[in-house]
Amino acid sequence: MAGMKEIRGKIKSVQNTRKITKAMEMVAASKMRRAQERMRAARPYADKVRAIAAHMSRANPEYRHPFMVANDGATTAGIILVTTDKGLCGGLNTNVLRATVQKFKELEEKGQKVEATAIGSKGLGFLNRFGAKVMSQVVHLGDTPHLDKLIGAVKTQLDLYSEGKLSAVYIAYTRFVNTMKQEAVIEQLLPLSSEHFEADDGTPATSWDYIYEPDAQAVVDELLVRYVEALVYQAVAENMASEQSARMVAMKAASDNAKTVISELQLVYNKSRQAAITKELSEIVGGAAAV
């Protein structure tokens, strides 16, 4: 009977765990929909800023913003690592961290030092354990990221690049493909290449005739900074949508596994109960025969 009592306790424990994972699955599904809406809402802004910056850059070819100039003499590269603040999201962080380590090795083989900016607690903890130099960080963004919280940490890298101290700036994050698929990617933020200013069909954007106030250089300077900030925000929004999708899938898998474990334990319990009843009946029959 002690064995049956222990099995009942295990069944109850797994049932309670399944209730938790099921609730977390439902919460993640709700947050995923909101995160996807924010991700989609951010894209038109970045696209429009890119288009305007492209038009103005072509209209003023004599001016080259520092973001568009390669710092060939710099021996340090910057990486902005975007991860989650929380766990329980499958291999989401593992994949982007693995890709980041590979990028570190590639840059170091080229004689480049690497300085990082961490967005998310998981990435910050990893970089500290990895021994990387962390120049800035931002954690605990919550479910609704605001650009104001990101600007300070990101601006550190942008300023260093403008001063010619960084050879390039990369951003590592998890791109949202669909609910079941997310991809760890590393993209070059700076220097801005001509690909950044191409239309969606791959053709160069056409030039417009602008009247500038106060002047073209000041407007281009502001636009390019806003554009890079928009790219970072888009990466964070994509990462958050990926996080909630991965968490929903992970919690669903956990709930399904818990259901399987409960069924197996229930079968063991029934067999034990059947064996106990059979034993009792045998004892009763044996006792009656003895009388």
Curated annotation (Swiss-Prot):
Principal cellular location given in the protein's record: membrane
Does the keyword Protein biosynthesis feature in the UniProt annotation? no
UniProt entry keywords in alphabetical sequence: ATP synthesis, Cell inner membrane, Cell membrane, CF(1), Hydrogen ion transport, Ion transport, Membrane, Transport
This chain's protein is named ATP synthase gamma chain
Q: Which gene encodes it?
A: atpG
Native species of this protein?
Burkholderia ambifaria (strain MC40-6)
Kindly state the subunit structure of this protein: F-type ATPases have 2 components, CF(1) - the catalytic core - and CF(0) - the membrane proton channel. CF(1) has five subunits: alpha(3), beta(3), gamma(1), delta(1), epsilon(1). CF(0) has three main subunits: a, b and c.
Any keyword Cell inner membrane?
yes
The protein's GO terms of the molecular function aspect are:
ATP binding; proton-transporting ATP synthase activity, rotational mechanism
Q: What biological process terms from GO does the record include?
A: proton motive force-driven plasma membrane ATP synthesis
List locations, semicolon-separated: Cell inner membrane
A GO CC term assigned to this protein in UniProt: plasma membrane
